[in-house]
């Protein structure tokens, strides 16, 4: 349970300047000025965020590729990958209050929804894909006598992921869970207005035992970081949740670069709008945060 005392103890914590997470190390370098993180709750400056560029993306992708090729994760025994992902889910659950409150301060999600739909859902997703690790089977194809045809499933390589601002932990886990369970390395870009909780969740992955370089976070703007990722010649798959126009851009860049595979979830907004003349404001608030 998330009680008011816990919320109050976390909501005023200072937030250190946030940077990329590359090769297991935080890095606040960027293209120039840092992005100011403004809390939507009261408009105050919360912290700063590293503004990545093409060079930062190239470094993160190179680190991810090297980690994939060295095999510490991609060739790890499936049962061992499973154990790491379960430990990660445990840490997400254990730090749920911190993650939820950090997310609220960063992107303004209502606290009840943030607690249920963010760390809770993310941990459940990671547990689901942890169980997938040792349950991926190949096939024996039907062939004529004297011929043996086998289908062997292997990780694809480096996965690039771009997620939006609204549910960074939940949507982040949707991207990270399957990619990591199958042995891939990942470079992920969170929304520049909602990066803090995702960064913290990825730090917890390293605490759980994920080898350095397997999971890398590059913060910054879509027009620079996202563009560089979708044009990278060394990212094998791009996954994206966001707008239709940006999805089209990613597909175009994928075709113009290395014909990388793309998996897109496009469009959709579900805002809660309460008008000034609402007859029962308290009921509207209770409905918005799931209490009725």
Question: Predicted regions: what is each one?
Answer:
Residues 148-149, 216-236:
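A structured beta-alpha segment of the ubiquitous adenosine-cofactor-binding alpha/beta core
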């Amino acid at each position: 349970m998330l009680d008011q005392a816990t919320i109050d103890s976390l909501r005023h914590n200072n937030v250190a300047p946030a940077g990329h997470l590359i090769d297991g190390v935080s890095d606040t370098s960027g293209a120039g000025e840092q992005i100011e993180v403004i809390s939507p709750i009261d408009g105050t400056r919360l912290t700063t965020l590293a503004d990545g560029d093409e060079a930062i993306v190239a470094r993160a992708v190179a680190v991810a590729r090297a980690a994939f090729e060295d095999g510490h994760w991609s060739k790890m025994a499936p049962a061992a990958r499973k154990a790491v992902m379960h430990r990660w889910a445990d840490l997400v659950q254990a730090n749920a209050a911190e993650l939820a409150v950090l997310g609220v301060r960063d992107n303004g999600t209502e606290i009840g929804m943030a607690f249920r739909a963010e760390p809770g859902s993310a941990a459940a997703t990671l547990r689901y894909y942890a169980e997938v690790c040792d349950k991926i089977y190949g096939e024996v194809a039907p062939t004529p006598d004297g011929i043996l045809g086998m289908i062997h499933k292997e990780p694809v390589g480096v996965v690039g992921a771009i997620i939006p601002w609204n549910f960074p932990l939940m949507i982040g886990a949707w991207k990270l869970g399957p990619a990591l369970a199958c042995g891939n390395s990942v470079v992920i870009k969170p929304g520049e207005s909602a990066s803090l909780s995702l960064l913290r969740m990825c730090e917890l992955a390293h605490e759980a035992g994920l080898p350095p370089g397997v999971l890398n976070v590059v913060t910054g703007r879509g027009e620079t970081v996202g563009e560089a990722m979708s044009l990278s010649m060394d990212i094998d798959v791009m996954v994206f949740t966001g707008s239709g126009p940006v999805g089209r851009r990613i597909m175009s860049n994928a075709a113009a670069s290395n014909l990388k595979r793309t998996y897109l979830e496009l469009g959709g907004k579900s805002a809660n709008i309460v008008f000034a003349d609402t007859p029962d404001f308290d009921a509207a608030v209770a409905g918005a945060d799931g209490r009725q």
